[in-house]
């Protein structure tokens, strides 16, 4: 029996060598009037998928396209479009911005196999078949004006079909021959079967042998091949995209490839929006943007709102000169939606109540992954020998139990500087939502997947508290750091840490005493001046723990112990005002905190709430005046963690303890910082008010939190839209179209600078990465590089972001940044709320 589709494929392979090719004004290659290749001037490929009876590869294909920030073109028959089992897949094709076009209604053969010039249907029959196909496409919300290209059934046509397609307002396209990709449908028992490996290698061979590589290719694959083929090419699709991406190719829709028009991009919050809050997306392009946009219901694909874009004037981003805000705040109906602006669509998102309620618990997964000691994510223990002392009252090298706590980021160091803040912020997140059901109990105290009757956020905070108590072994003693940058000795899992700090490979690690003096075991000394920064945050965490557990019969003794430790360490801070910075050893990079009055204010305010002792209230007011509005806000450059924490929680916690006059002063401090950020945000089209320094995402979370706290303090809603823009930046409304949290949203950081995920080939949910940095910072840092080509190159501007494991400046998750985002989202649950 003759396999006519295989004969057709061979025909095209032979024809490519002899066809009479014509080139139109934009450099396309034609055969018999149909386009078989786009312009070869750029490294762009149109990935073309056809479907009629099967679709088992569809989900994998769409997932891989999403992973590569790529778009494809899908040509489906009417029978495919009306198959209820395929409807979710088709809706996903549309909602994720891919091209959806016709492939005939019934998959009939239009031209004779042996004599292709012989047409097997009349023009009337062709038109009826095509019209039915187009009608079924429109049922998925695709406007007829957006359907411009037609790929014929069996990829077989003649001049009549080309002409009749044009009469129907469509341009006929077919695959570029020469790669054997179209053979991916053949069954295992077919005598002309081509394995997925051979197809894969054939594509790469053609890329090497063609003078233009695969530039302009229409690379055809089938969305499904049915049960007759077990060697599914979809399983190799991601590998193919990886290989071609590494060679510099971009994957675009067929209309973008052939029309050579600058694309439009739409960026929105990929998680979603509250019913009553501002809802503003951003569209951008190299050229003038469409005047209007529409909001489309992702379930029905019906337009529910149409609006006009508001041009953002006098600002640009990178190569993009045209930006517009797409405001759909009037939509207050719950559902799942996406935005369409011209040919572009956003990633889908939700509108509804409590949109952010699941996120704090999601972010806790990363906190558990960062645990030192017993790590539930790895299911094993690490660093049991932490540690041996340096500086302080004990002989250097004296054993001190500093096990537990959290690894700070992608490395394995542990800092009280960041951990104290993370612990306090998680406790405050719970305290502010004391009666909320949104904090769930999925794990036990060790982080294992079994309940223990305590919300997971308190389990995680308790993990931090237990470690902090170990760092305060006596009333006059406080330790602040375990390990140093000798840790940066190659990639390994925490239990396999081989670093030698002087007590043998993989042995005890150094534990630094907080003496308030410059420290550093080699040439790089810190600029420490005191311990008040550490002490204030320590006291805040311990006093919050007491407030939460003092009436809990099972934990009241622990609460009392925390309060006593908080008082003792607060006294150390009072006696030694100033900052204890992080210590480095081999390089100049360290935590360079210079502020401390804000921390003492917070600690004093929480101690007053815990004890009612007037001295603490007096101290809090004094430190509040000293801290004032000093922060990074409004600055273009600062030292690393110079103004830490990145917002002063102390003003918020003191606010309802003071008289009206002092309340105005505290609110004014917050307002001053926010206004400086608004001014900075006016210089970019996304209204982002933070400097793009190291950990800009942490700054952004802090800014959102300050706006939310200001509103809770005063009832003043003036900053709500500005705060929403900052939050939305973290959730996808940015040039790169990615959230800054792993596994949150449709597109998120995947190749993060984190040893545990890279070495285990697993992903972790909820990690906040550092976020974009100024291009000049990226280029100045030692040891920072990326793999080329950069898939996000088109979207880089004055600030750059790389989803690349080698870029620790923008794509390294931080434990404390993630904890601060937990507080941010906890406030969002009740935002807008009452005081």
Where in the sequence are the language-model features?
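Active-site beta->alpha N-cap acidic-glycine motif
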Residues: 23-118, 131-149, 240-243
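A conserved hydrophobic secondary-structure block that centers on an alpha-helix together
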Residues: 455, 516-569, 576
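Catalytic domains of cell-wall/extracellular-matrix polysaccharide-remodeling enzymes
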Residues: 82-85, 107-220, 224-259
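Aromatic (Trp/Tyr) and acidic
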Residues: 271-347, 353, 365-424, 428-429, ...
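Acidic, glycine-anchored loop motifs typical of Ca2+
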Residues: 445-453
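Structural recognition of the beta-strand scaffold that forms the well-ordered cores
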Residues: 45-48, 72-76, 99-104, 148-152, ...
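Bacterial N-terminal signal peptides
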Residues: 8-18
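Carboxylate/His-rich catalytic cores and anion/metal-binding grooves
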Residues: 456-482
């Amino acid at each position: 029996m003759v396999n006519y589709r295989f004969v057709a494929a061979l025909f095209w392979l032979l024809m490519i060598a002899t066809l009479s090719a014509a080139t139109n004004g934009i450099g396309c290659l034609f055969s018999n009037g149909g386009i078989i290749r786009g312009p070869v001037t750029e490294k762009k490929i149109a990935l073309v998928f056809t479907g009629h009876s099967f679709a088992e590869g569809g989900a994998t294909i769409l997932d891989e396209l999403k992973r590569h920030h790529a778009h494809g073109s899908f040509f489906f028959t009417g029978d495919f479009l009306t198959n209820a089992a395929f409807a979710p897949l088709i809706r996903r094709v549309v909602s994720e911005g891919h091209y959806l076009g016709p492939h005939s209604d019934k998959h009939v053969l239009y031209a004779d196999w042996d004599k292709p010039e012989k047409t097997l249907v009349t023009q009337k029959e062709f038109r009826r078949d095509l019209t039915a196909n187009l009608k079924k496409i429109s049922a998925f919300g695709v406007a007829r004006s957006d359907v411009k290209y037609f790929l014929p059934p069996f990829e077989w046509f003649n001049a009549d079909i080309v002409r009749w397609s044009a009469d129907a307002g469509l341009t006929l396209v077919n695959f570029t021959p020469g790669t054997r990709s179209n053979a991916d449908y053949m069954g295992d028992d077919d005598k002309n079967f081509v394995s997925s490996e051979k197809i894969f290698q054939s594509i790469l061979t053609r890329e090497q042998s063609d003078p233009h590589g695969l530039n302009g290719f229409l690379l055809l694959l089938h969305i499904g091949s049915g049960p007759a083929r077990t060697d599914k090419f979809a399983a190799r699709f991601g590998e193919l995209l990886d290989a071609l991406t590494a060679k510099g190719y971009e994957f675009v829709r067929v209309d973008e490839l052939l029309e050579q028009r600058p694309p439009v991009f739409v960026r929105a919050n990929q998680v979603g929006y509250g019913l009553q809050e501002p809802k503003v997306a951003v569209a951008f392009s190299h050229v003038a943007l469409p005047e209007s946009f529409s909001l489309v219901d992702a379930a029905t694909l019906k337009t529910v709102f149409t609006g006009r874009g508001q041009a953002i004037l006098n600002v640009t981003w990178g190569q993009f000169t045209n930006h517009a805000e797409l405001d759909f705040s009037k939509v207050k109906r719950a559902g799942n939606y996406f935005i369409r602006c011209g040919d572009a669509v956003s990633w889908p998102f939700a509108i509804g109540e409590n949109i952010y309620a699941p996120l704090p618990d999601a972010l806790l997964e990363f906190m558990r992954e960062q645990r030192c000691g017993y790590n539930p994510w790895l299911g094993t223990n690490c660093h049991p020998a932490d540690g041996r002392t340096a500086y302080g009252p004990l002989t250097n090298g004296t054993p001190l139990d500093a096990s537990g706590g959290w690894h700070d980021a992608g490395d394995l160091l542990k800092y009280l500087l960041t951990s104290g803040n993370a612990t306090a912020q998680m406790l405050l997140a719970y305290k502010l939502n004391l009666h909320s059901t949104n904090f769930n109990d999925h794990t036990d105290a060790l982080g294992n997947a079994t309940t223990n009757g305590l919300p997971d956020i308190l389990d995680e905070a308790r993990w931090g508290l237990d470690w902090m108590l170990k760092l305060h072994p006596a009333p006059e003693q406080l330790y602040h750091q375990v390990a140093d940058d000798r840790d940066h000795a190659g990639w390994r899992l925490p239990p396999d840490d081989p670093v030698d700090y002087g007590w043998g490979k993989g042995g005890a690690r150094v534990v630094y005493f907080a003496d308030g003096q410059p420290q550093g075991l080699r040439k790089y000394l810190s600029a420490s001046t005191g311990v008040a920064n550490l002490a204030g945050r320590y006291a805040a965490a311990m006093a919050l723990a007491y407030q939460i557990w003092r009436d809990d019969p099972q934990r009241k003794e622990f609460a009392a112990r925390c309060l006593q430790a908080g008082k003792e360490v607060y006294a150390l801070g009072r006696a030694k005002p100033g900052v204890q910075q992080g210590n480095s050893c081999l390089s100049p990079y360290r935590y360079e905190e210079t502020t401390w009055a804000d921390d003492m204010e917070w600690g004093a305010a929480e101690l007053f709430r815990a004890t009612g002792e007037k001295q603490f209230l007096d101290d809090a007011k004094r430190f509040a005046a000293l801290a004032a509005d000093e922060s990074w806000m409004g600055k273009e450059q600062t030292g690393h963690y110079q103004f830490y924490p990145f917002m002063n929680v102390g003003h918020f916690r003191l606010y309802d303890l003071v008289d009206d006059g002092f309340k105005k002063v505290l609110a004014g401090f917050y307002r001053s910082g926010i206004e400086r950020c608004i001014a900075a945000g006016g210089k970019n089209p996304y209204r982002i008010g933070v400097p793009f320094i190291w950990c800009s995402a942490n700054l952004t979370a802090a800014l959102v939190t300050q706006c939310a706290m200001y509103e809770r303090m005063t009832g003043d809603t003036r900053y709500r839209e500005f705060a929403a823009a900052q939050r939305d930046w973290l959730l996808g409304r940015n040039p790169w179209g990615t959230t800054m949290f792993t596994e949150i949203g449709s597109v998120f950081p995947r190749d993060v600078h984190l040893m545990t995920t890279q070495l285990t080939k697993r992903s972790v949910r909820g990690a906040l990465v550092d976020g974009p940095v100024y291009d000049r910072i990226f280029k100045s840092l030692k040891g920072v590089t990326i793999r080329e080509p950069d898939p996000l190159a088109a979207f880089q501007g004055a600030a750059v972001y790389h989803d690349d494991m080698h870029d620790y400046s923008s794509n390294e998750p931080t434990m404390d940044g993630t904890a601060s985002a937990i507080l941010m989202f906890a406030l969002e649950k009740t935002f807008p709320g009452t005081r």
